[in-house]
């Protein structure tokens, strides 16, 4: 006998699912433009390639490892809740990476500060991807599968 999914549960699926997709859109659409805006010169494409490759590697490894961990522990709501909160914080943190701030903090020339900012974006993108893959790819997708009826 199948269990009917309530309107409230559908709303949770939709809202959490959309929030996750918005965060991925920010990463996939805007980080390229953000790095370009730093003025890293002709090395722009190199930084974008590294960003995409590193993020993909982190996403695959995190989804496999943390998905397995959430399967074993069985606390998907915890992984979803904490992961989404940390994912949001890490996404918002991109706004604090500014070339002028790096110049002021470290006394770097403009191009060196721009390249440092690009590296910080790559590192923060990997951190953001870790939280996003944990909460959305590993835990949320499995939670939806577990709580819905395929028949």
What role is predicted for each listed range?
Residues 2-58:
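Helix-loop boundary and gating motifs at the non-cytosolic
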Residues 26, 61-62, 136:
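Residue positions within transmembrane alpha-helices of multi-pass solute transporters
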Residues 34-39, 72-73, 143-148:
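Helix-to-coil boundary motifs at intracellular loop junctions of multi-pass secondary transporters
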Residues 48-70, 84-96:
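Central cavity-lining transmembrane alpha-helices of secondary-active solute carriers
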Residues 81-115:
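C-terminal ends and interior cores of transmembrane alpha-helices
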Residues 125-151:
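Cytoplasmic helix-loop-helix junction between adjacent transmembrane helices
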